[in-house]
Amino acid sequence: MFPDNVKFISTPRFIEGGAGADCFGNFNLALHVGDESNAVSANREFLEKHYKLPSSPKWINQTHSSVCVRVDSKFSSASADASYSRTSGVVCGVLTADCMPVFICDKRGTVVGIAHAGWRGLVGGVIESLIEEIDVEGNELLVHLGPVSYTHLTLPTICRV
């Protein structure tokens, strides 16, 4: 379904070879949740090797917003909830638990993007922001909705006219 040069990965909380405390899962990739930073670093290294990534993922500081940033090989950090790249070999990454990752690429595999889609981001338009930034005709886009932990998902009642 996706171009051969595009790879989307969703990781489990637990994996053989992972490091970290059980309360975070042994394959925690998040530095901001209180897990040991050396365990997270080891898991990030394992992620690159195990999944044969072409480069280290470009992580964003997720803020439950609709902000989308473009990343390339020189990208270091930004506060956003979506990122995209047109640079071959660049890996865009988001962290999710009770939010859903939304993967987007064009049919030719020349642009890839990912959104951290929680209810605040969805209401705020994070997916729309990503699609607008990617700037590809809708009939040329491919979308994959990643897994979400529905047992921890909180959805408030929202009415919008």
What is each model feature region?
Residues 1-155, 160:
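Active-site microenvironment for binding and transforming phosphate-containing groups
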